[in-house]
Every structure is written in structure tokens, then in C-alpha cells.
Amino acid sequence: MHILLSNDDGIQAEGIKTLAKELRKFAQVTVVAPDRNRSAASSSLTLVEPLRPMKLDNGDYSINGTPADCVHLALNGFLSGQIDLVVSGINAGVNLGDDVIYSGTVAAALEGRHLSLPAIAVSLDGRQHYESAAIIVSQLIPKLYGRLLKSREIININVPDLPYSEIKGIKVCHLGYRAAAADIIKQKDPRGEEIYWIGPIGLAENESEGTDFHAVKNGYVSITPIQTDMTAYHSMTALQQWLDKE
């Protein structure tokens, strides 16, 4: 098996290094990742400047672009040979609920799926036990690979930041959702000019049983199948009826 591995925390992040080491125990792994942290880049592509791959001494590649750029470039002519699976992560911090809209980690996996390959995104609820998440992914790939080949979904995995022996199990979950984000943060630079920072993300608003929030909060790995079709089918008939009213 040949795995393309990317992330949004950057080529030097501990998460991608730990995952690459674990995956290389049973697969050929090619790493193509951003040259710096590109968290919350979502599925953005770089269209107004060239992308410049740099091969590192260990054979990995860094790209001056987004996570989606990395996967798009790798699968559309940059890499030679067949890729069987795209894996993105391990992200430092969860991608639960609404997070998947912004997440560069999830976006890298979605780009792989868009280009007709099975794909997995994996995130850790912290910055400590990357080994736990890496082991979980290596165990799940043989079980999930056949299903992923037959669907247009990706698998979004979130792992509690616990030693592997303390993880309670795995649950298939639907996405929860967060409350609105906090206000932006207004400051002044050394010249007295106003600058702004994006504020903290909203707290979990729906973390009921069955959600990814609930699983991770209670020590379980959450697995959520995600698709790119965002159509709210249940609203289509009502919307059409409303439009048809005189």
C-alpha cells in the first residue's frame, strides 16, 4: 500500500512525524505537507502564485501552499506511481462538529476524495499522546480501506489525548455543533495602528450522546463519515412549496 500523508500543522509538526513513523511499519508513505502551519486553511487552493516543492533530506516534501494544494499537487502529476490512500494528520487539536468546515486537516482528506482516492483525517484532542492516535489509525486502515474505496466519503477520526491503554473504545458518531465564536480581539501594533485577531472558537453547543463531541469527551475515539454534498435534502420540498405560493 502506498499512502500519501499530509496535514495542516506543517511539515515539522510532531503529529505528522509520529504518524509517518507508524504508517511506515506496514506501508510505503510519501509525505507532502505545507512548509508552515496552515491551520484553518479549509479547502483553499493557491491560484495567484506558483507552488514550490522542496525535497527534504529524509525524502519528504514541503510545499509553500495549503493542505489542499499539497494533495492536489501530489495527485495531479507531481508524484510518480500509484497512491492508494490519502491520510491527513495528526492534527494538534480536535476537528469536531463545525470545525470540519474550517479544518485544513479535513480539507486535505477531502481533496484526496475529490480526486477519487479513499481518505482519512485524524486529529488529537491535545498535543501529548500522538502515539495513541497513530496506533489507532494504523489499526483502522485495514478495516476501513475497503469501505472507503466504494464510497465518496472520507472518515474523520478524533482521538482523546490519553495513553493508548486508557482509551475506552471507538464510536461511530455524527457531527455535533458549536455555539457562535467569541468576538474578535482588537489590539494596537507598535506604531499605534489597530490590528485584529480572530477570537476563540465557540464552545460545544450540541455534545449529546451520539455526537463526536460526546465520544471524545468521554474517552472514546470518534469516527464520522463525511461527504462533500452539503444539500439539506429534508428542506427541499418545503422550500419549493414556499416559492410556489402566490
UniProtKB/Swiss-Prot annotation:
EC numbers on record: 3.1.3.5
InterPro entries xref list: SurE, SurE-like_Pase/nucleotidase, SurE-like_sf
Localization of this protein: Cytoplasm
Cysteines paired by S-S bonds: none
Binding of a divalent metal cation, residues: 8-9, 39, 91
SUPFAM superfamilies cross-referenced by the UniProt entry: SurE-like
Cofactor(s) required, per the database record: a divalent metal cation
Comment on bound cofactor: Binds 1 divalent metal cation per subunit.
Main localization (coarse): cytoplasm
Record GO cellular component, one term: cytoplasm
Role: Nucleotidase that shows phosphatase activity on nucleoside 5'-monophosphates.
UniProt family annotation: Belongs to the SurE nucleotidase family.
Record's protein name: 5'-nucleotidase SurE
Gene: surE
